[in-house]
Amino acid sequence: MSRIGRMPVVIPAGVTVQVADNNVVTVKGPLGTLEKQLPERMTITVDGNQALVTRPTDEKEDRSLHGLTRALLQDMVIGVSEGYKKVLMIIGVGYKAVKQGNNLLLYLGHSLMPVTGMPQERFIISDTPTVKLEVPTEDEIKKQGIDKMTTEKVSTSLIIVVRGIDKQEVGQMAAVIRGKRPPEPYHGKGVRYIEENVRRRVGKTGK
């Protein structure tokens, strides 16, 4: 991780990085603003279009924190400039997803299950959301190239796009949705990441 830590973080045009007391870092870009407190033992300096992270010692813990801090800062810069996206696919007869207000409603073969466990504002669709949930139309699926990301047949209401500027929160939200009904190994029914390869099992045969 120390090798990664030594690499400067390139700050693209339109993005600003500010470092305050206690290593509270604010990164602003065209997609929004992120603020996080990074490990205080590291020193973060901004010089022109680069941000550099340095460590106080070569101790094992500092080397580890060095790479981690640099990676977190890089994720923030990418988030506000390019954003992050996770695409999930629903497989199963009668299964579907419906965007209703701030909630994503999943019909997965049993009771209606609104995704919960996270602040409601993360489901609000706005110009600069932290996390945005989408159920794209067929035209949007083709425009975004989602139909080319898998060999499975895809259609609207069977695709969920989780989009946002915070890499960790996008991944966590996608995991929450997938966890509502993970793909089962016999028929592959359930919610999976679109690039996920589900290992199938052969069911028992009658004698």
Regions found by a protein language model. Give the residues of each.
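N-terminal intrinsically disordered, cationic/polar leader segments
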Residues: 2-66, 70-78, 82-207
